[in-house]
């Protein structure tokens, strides 16, 4: 079964726009779990423009499903993850100033750095995932570096899907097959939505997890959070 992890960064963005604690990030996360989410994802950035370090500490003891923390492995991020000990850490190559993730790691160029970071997290018993493009070589070096999983960067799929779904998904199917041959787990995320998720899943049914935030929270404005989560879960069947 492919798990749905809900990224709640956009909820924190809304809270921070006004100040105060509305919406309550922790309550929304717990409600997502109650409505069927299999996990919660957060991406704390150094400027805390959405998720704050305090949110991460508040969430950890209360969540009943898997907790995934994603981010660039700066010393501060590594320290946070080792203290919180989530179920999974996802390493992304973001510059702190980026609005959102827009590329995967070059795992060959960054092999030594990633190996060192992954070794630290693996030693703490935290499942590790590395954000990569759908490229067999990048997946191979992620596996060699010690990653338990890779997360495929799916924005190119989402962009190409409306014009030619088969062509859009083809490189991801090949990448997924490469991951399976290497014995490494497979996650996916970025711009997956109700429009394109089911087709992606049908072509790669051995996906372990998808992480979805922006589209899901946007859909919830119209459909409500509970119905939206169920709609996304239905796309993974």
UniProtKB/Swiss-Prot annotation:
GO cellular component: cytosol
UniProt-listed Enzyme Commission number(s): 2.6.99.2
Site (Transition state stabilizer): 151
GO BP terms: pyridoxine biosynthetic process
Binding site for 1-deoxy-D-xylulose 5-phosphate: 45, 50, 100
Protein origin, superkingdom: Bacteria
Family matches, as SUPFAM superfamilies: Pyridoxine 5'-phosphate synthase
Binding site for 3-amino-2-oxopropyl phosphate: 7, 18, 191, 213-214
Keywords linked to the UniProt accession: Cytoplasm, Pyridoxine biosynthesis, Transferase
Keyword flag Thylakoid: no
Pathway of action: Cofactor biosynthesis; pyridoxine 5'-phosphate biosynthesis; pyridoxine 5'-phosphate from D-erythrose 4-phosphate: step 5/5
Family matches, as CDD domains: PNPsynthase
Subcellular location: Cytoplasm
Example GO molecular function: pyridoxine 5'-phosphate synthase activity
Similarity comment: family membership: Belongs to the PNP synthase family.
Protein's UniProt name: Pyridoxine 5'-phosphate synthase
Originating organism: Bacteroides fragilis (strain YCH46)
Lineage of the species this protein comes from: Bacteria, Pseudomonadati, Bacteroidota, Bacteroidia, Bacteroidales
Gene that specifies this protein: pdxJ
